[in-house]
Amino acid sequence: MPQKVRIALDAMGGDFGPSVVIPGAAIALGRHPDAEFLLFGDSALIDKELAAHPALKKVSRVVHTDVAVSMHDKPSQALRRGRKVSSMWLAIEAVKKGEADVAVSAGNTGALMAMARFCLRTLPGIDRPAIAATWPTVRGDSVVLDLGATIGGDAAHLKALAVMGAAMASVLFDLERPTVGLLNIGVEEIKGGEEIREAAELLRAMQSPPFEFIGFVEGDGIGSGAADVIVSEGFSGNIALKAAEGTARQIIQLLRDAMSRTWSAKIGYLFARGAFRALRDKIDPNKSNGGVFLGLNGIVVKSHGGTNADGFAYAVDVSYDMVRYDLLTKINQTLNRETGALVSTPSAQEAVS
């Protein structure tokens, strides 16, 4: 019998806390019956939600704490107030102690990053982790990073992101040499700032890298699937992410409005319903929920704070897959082969939201 996947959940994280986290975990359990859960937070609120999900209750253990990190806490505040005692910290610490294989939180991104870095520590040479996620494209899926873990960063930081992102793509997509592109304002070699041009030179100079560097990729190349891995510093990456999510929701709403405007449109929708549903499912931001913190001595997955139960379930799916794919070990192996990419990035600033 395969070993259970042990998932630690910050039950108080996000805009809605247990009312989304617990139903979301129940949905994910239906897809992954070999999972079990550690639930950290207010036991009264958690037990109230668990009462409606007996199957989840059977494979869960609740650990009570009165302290929760709010969505408005600064990372420094969260560490001072929540270290050792908050639901977010305890979920991460469960990974450090070997009680869980992965931690998932929908809480404050800056606080989660600070706590994860402080508790788990980063891999040798990595100054700060990155947030990586799969991104739906016309060619399938790509890995995009950094989606907001750090603001800024030098060329060596971007090189390290490329190495980690390529390792993740190799594991998830079963690719021997995934293609890697640097997000830029143009594809010409003279475009972009000094850091990104220098990063391109560093990547081209790598000896037999486990990926193919294709150069610069513009913003429209993310959705077109121009590369298996798109690398950006966290400021630009987060803007791209939020813009894409907003566009996806706008398209879904515009289609819904157009299909309900007239009787002929409604009749047409009946004939094309399957195609419209497929499009909606492809671009639904909930189905791309779950960013993986790369560069840590442990696996932490970040869910959107405002997601619903279905969206949180997809974040749990991501955490499950990271464990089943043994992603951490495989990324570490790749990084160890490319020790030249593992350098500190003193210019990078910690994101706070």
From Swiss-Prot:
Pfam families: FA_synthesis. It is found in: Cytoplasm. The keyword Ligase does not apply. Pathway: Lipid metabolism; phospholipid metabolism. GO terms for cellular component: cytoplasm. The keyword Transferase applies. Its EC number is 2.3.1.274. It catalyses: a fatty acyl-[ACP] + phosphate = an acyl phosphate + holo-[ACP]. One of its GO terms (biological process) is fatty acid biosynthetic process. It comes from the Bacteria. GO terms for molecular function: phosphate:acyl-[acyl carrier protein] acyltransferase activity. It is an enzyme of class 2 (transferase). Its main location: cytoplasm. Keywords: Cytoplasm, Lipid biosynthesis, Lipid metabolism, Phospholipid biosynthesis, Phospholipid metabolism, Transferase. InterPro entries: FA_synthesis, Phospholipid_synth_PlsX-like. Homodimer. Probably interacts with PlsY. Catalyzes the reversible formation of acyl-phosphate (acyl-PO(4)) from acyl-[acyl-carrier-protein] (acyl-ACP). This enzyme utilizes acyl-ACP as fatty acyl donor, but not acyl-CoA. Belongs to the PlsX family. This is Phosphate acyltransferase. It comes from Rhodopseudomonas palustris (strain BisB5). The lineage of its organism: Bacteria, Pseudomonadati, Pseudomonadota, Alphaproteobacteria, Hyphomicrobiales.
